[in-house]
UniProtKB/Swiss-Prot annotation:
Subcellular location: Nucleus
Acidic residues composition-biased segments: 85-102
Principal place of residence: nucleus
Any one GO BP annotation for this protein: snRNA transcription by RNA polymerase III
CC per GO annotation: nuclear body; nucleolus
UniProt protein name: snRNA-activating protein complex subunit 5
Task performed by this protein: Part of the SNAPc complex required for the transcription of both RNA polymerase II and III small-nuclear RNA genes. Binds to the proximal sequence element (PSE), a non-TATA-box basal promoter element common to these 2 types of genes. Recruits TBP and BRF2 to the U6 snRNA TATA box.
InterPro entries the record matches: SNAPC5
Sorted UniProt keywords: Nucleus, Transcription, Transcription regulation
Entry GO MF terms: RNA polymerase II general transcription initiation factor activity; RNA polymerase III general transcription initiation factor activity
Oligomeric form and interacting partners: Part of the SNAPc complex composed of 5 subunits: SNAPC1, SNAPC2, SNAPC3, SNAPC4 and SNAPC5. SNAPC5 interacts with SNAPC4.
Domain of life of the organism encoding this protein: Eukaryota
Residue segments, region Disordered: 73-102
Length: 102
């Protein structure tokens, strides 16, 4: 019973770290979205002021926008635990199993 409680506490800690990491990522994405919307709006205003935007503006905008293909190919890493933590936990579980078998 006690080991199950410890296991649940570790799982809770992991989930809380994951929640924090996802919250941070969501905030970064919101900031990026606002920046992109701002660039789109400024491009729209520029196009209404002049029929053809200056080549320098187009080049400058393209430097700040992320490559969509690269973003889509990026894998999302949700693990908040290091491989060392996982190995330590596995070793602890093995030790607990050995103790309970004895």
């Amino acid at each position: 019973m006690l080991s199950r409680l410890q296991e649940l506490r570790k799982e809770e800690e992991t989930l809380l770290r994951l929640k924090a990491a996802l919250h941070d990522q969501l905030n970064r994405l919101k900031v990026e979205e606002l920046a992109l919307q701002s660039m789109i709006n400024s491009r729209g205003r520029t196009e209404t002021l002049s029929s053809q935007p200056a080549p320098e503006q187009l080049c400058d905008m393209s430097l700040h926008v992320d490559n969509e293909v690269t973003i889509n190919q990026t894998t999302l890493k949700l693990s908040t635990r290091s491989p060392m933590e996982e190995e330590e936990e596995e070793e602890e579980e093995e030790e607990e199993e050995e103790e309970s078998d004895s």
